[in-house]
Amino acid sequence: MLIILVNGTAAWGCRLVSGRFALVPVRDLKTHEAAQPDRVRRVMKQMRSTGVVKKAIVVDSKSKVVLDGVHRLNALKSLGAVRVPAWLIDYSDDAVLVFSKDRKSQISKDSVVRAATLGPKFPPKSTRHMTKAKDGSLVPLSRIEAEISVPLSDLLRSH
């Protein structure tokens, strides 16, 4: 997969989703979905093994709701991280869409923010945040996230 970042914008045959990269304090982030403990443990093991975080989470810049990366966030929290690499985007942008897991029904962005701020959370892996490719097909935001290499040690309390 080829990802091009131009002035903080990711393009992958899609309408552009603008954003910026930042290290965000863990305490500021809110999740709208529950996490699967086994998956969190697998992600933790991989992060410990490599010593780096290879993919930023996707976060709404305004509400600080995690749109993609709940398991990565929970793994980082469990490892003692106080900062998380994040791709901050404007969730109100029409280019960002949210669907149910099966992609058959659209979910409102308001319900995602409500679940994160007031509860209850959605079940694990139940929402899919997408954008449209130039051909009209849906592309998960996770497919247009740039790979990164942030040392785990840079995110921990002791740093």
Task: Show the residue positions of the predicted features.
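Basic- and aromatic-enriched surface patches that contact anionic nucleotides/nucleic acids
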Residues: 35, 49, 65-159
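Short alpha-helix boundary/capping and kink motifs at helix termini
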Residues: 2-62, 74-77, 81-89
